[in-house]
């Protein structure tokens, strides 16, 4: 039975590429807009790729023993992906996160068997990170994933996402648009590609402006990610919270596609690019990191 999987880990990747014809026409895009639907991963986000790749890298490096405990400070999709992949592989996982994160995320990680330690909300992610580092310091069998610094993060896209895009388009890709979280998805295998990074307008650190509060989950961490390489990026576009959410809603209504808020930001940027005269007949691929269900209670 060739189409039967033996583990959820085998279901990560090979996500569909969808031509958003109605949305492109409605927004007068001269280019074809192709959405890489990462919410087709088993835990509904692009971070499933990163979670699995980080675990596999630890396995390949011989770092794991029967007492190994993976530790990560995260408030979002990476933690959920790690919880599911660790459950499938039989590993222990401890997640640290601020106490003011949504109950849905906390419950979902615990549902997969992860231990979730909540830190004071006033300490933000820095507090969660400090707690994770303390746990690793006290336990010689603990391994901290450090997604922002883990080479497996960009490798998940260099050897996965980007290859899939090139195969599915026959290499006919002119522009790649991605909202920037850890910046791993900006790693490509095509030197001729024009790469556009997207960040929140109120926290446009890639454009040299100060960090600030915003309402686009998963991106705009307030600092330049370690893997971000401006030599690989042709343009940085900043999108407002309202533009991101409005585009996500419009995509749902016109295409029946439940894209998340960061996907809305990336699509908004792609549609603006697609309206440029020189984009006529071009193909723009947009990374759609996750779906809207995880954010319905906060929009």
Please give the residue ranges for each predicted region.
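PLP-dependent amino-acid enzyme catalytic core
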Residues: 1-299
């Amino acid at each position: 039975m060739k189409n039967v999987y033996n583990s959820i880990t085998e279901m990560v990747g090979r996500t569909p590429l969808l031509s958003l014809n109605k949305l492109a026409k409605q927004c007068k895009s001269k280019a074809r807009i192709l959405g890489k639907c990462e919410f087709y991963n088993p835990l509904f986000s692009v971070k499933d790729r990163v979670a699995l790749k980080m675990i596999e890298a630890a396995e390949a490096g011989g770092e794991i023993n029967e007492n190994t405990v993976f530790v990560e400070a995260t408030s979002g999709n990476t933690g959920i992906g790690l919880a599911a992949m660790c459950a499938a592989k039989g590993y222990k996982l401890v997640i640290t996160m601020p106490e003011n994160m949504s109950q849905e995320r906390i419950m979902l990680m615990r549902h997969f068997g992860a231990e979730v330690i909540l830190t004071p909300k006033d300490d933000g992610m820095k507090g969660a990170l400090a707690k994770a580092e303390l746990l690793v310091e006290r336990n010689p069998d603990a391994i901290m994933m450090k997604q922002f610094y883990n080479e497996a993060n960009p490798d998940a896209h260099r050897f996965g996402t980007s290859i899939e895009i090139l195969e599915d388009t026959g290499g006919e890709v002119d522009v790649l648009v991605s909202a920037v979280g850890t910046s791993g998805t900006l790693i490509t295998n095509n030197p001729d590609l024009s790469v556009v990074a997207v960040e929140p307008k109120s926290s446009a650190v890639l454009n040299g402006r100060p960090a600030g509060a915003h309402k686009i989950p998963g991106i705009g961490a307030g600092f330049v990610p370690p893997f971000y390489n401006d030599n690989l990026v042709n343009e940085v576009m900043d999108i407002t919270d309202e533009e991101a959410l409005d585009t996500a809603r419009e995509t749902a209504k016109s295409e029946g596609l439940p894209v998340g808020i960061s996907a809305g930001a990336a699509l908004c940027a792609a549609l603006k690019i697609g309206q440029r005269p020189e984009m006529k007949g071009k193909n723009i691929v947009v990374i759609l990191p996750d779906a809207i269900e995880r954010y319905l209670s906060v929009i």
